[in-house]
Every structure is written in C-alpha cells, then in structure tokens.
From Swiss-Prot:
Keywords: Cytoplasm, Endonuclease, Hydrolase, Magnesium, Nuclease, Ribosome biogenesis, RNA-binding, rRNA processing, rRNA-binding
Origin: domain of life: Bacteria
Cellular location(s): Cytoplasm
Protein name listed in UniProt: Mini-ribonuclease 3
CDD domains per the UniProt record, alphabetical: RIBOc (cd00593)
Record gene name: mrnC
Length: 135
C-alpha cells in the first residue's frame, strides 16, 4: 500500500494529473461533448495550469479546504520539479502542481467522497468563470 502522507509531492501531482484528467473527460462526455476537437479544447480549459491555479485561489479564498488539505497544497506548491513551464509562469505552474498533488493525495487515500467534492467544485468554479461549457 502507498502511504500518500509520506509520498513526494511531485509523485502525488503525477497521480493527481491523471485522476483529474479522467474526471474532466467523463464530465465532458456526460455533457454530450463528443467531437474530438471540441473535447480537446474544452478539456484544456479545465486541465491547464492557469485553470488549476484559478481553482486553488478559489478554494483558499472560500475556506473550502481543511488544514490538512492546505498543508498538502503548500507541499505541492513548494515542490521543485526542476523543469521550466512552457506556457505559463512559475507561480501558476506551482499552484497547478499543488492542485494536482491534492487530487492525487485524496485518490491514494481512497477518499472518494472528498475527492468528488473537490473536483466537482473545481468544475463549477471554472464553468462559472468561463461562462459555462454548454456551447
């Protein structure tokens, strides 16, 4: 069994990236989005570093997270990947990594209910800020 509480933040983010991507793909298909180009464009609007950073800011501003979750975010944000982000600034990239670490953390702890709450909140925040994805 993997001890998510001791796992490297970048490893948590690695898992979280895959888990979050799966949630988003399911969400888009559930909304009836089936054309490949549309799926890619809409998917990117949820999984980009910029989008994930927006979610982190919202979760922190609204006190949505527990102290433990905020600690996971801090660990993820402070992790040094050694890579330079291509399409965003370092701060946005670090917040994105923090969000993915939080998703990976809950996934590996099998906290399905809380994972669902966080992901569905993220989707709601991004759809509201972008005017929805019903187009």
């Amino acid at each position: 069994m993997i001890d998510a509480k001791q796992l490297n933040s970048l490893a948590l983010a690695y898992m979280g990236d895959a888990v979050y991507e799966q949630y988003i793909r399911y969400h888009l298909l559930q909304k009836g989005k089936v054309r490949p180009n549309q799926l890619h464009r809409l998917g990117t609007s949820f999984v980009s570093a910029k989008a994930q950073a927006k979610v982190v800011y919202h979760l922190l501003e609204t006190a949505f997270l527990t102290e433990e979750e905020e600690a996971v975010l801090r660990r993820g944000r402070n992790a040094n990947s050694g890579t330079v982000p291509k399409n965003t600034d370092v701060q946005t990239y670090r917040h994105s990594t923090a969000f993915e670490a939080l998703i990976g953390y809950h996934h590996l702890l099998n906290n399905r209910e809380r994972l669902d709450e966080i992901v569905y909140k993220a989707i709601a925040v991004l759809e509201e800020q972008e005017g929805g994805t019903s187009s």
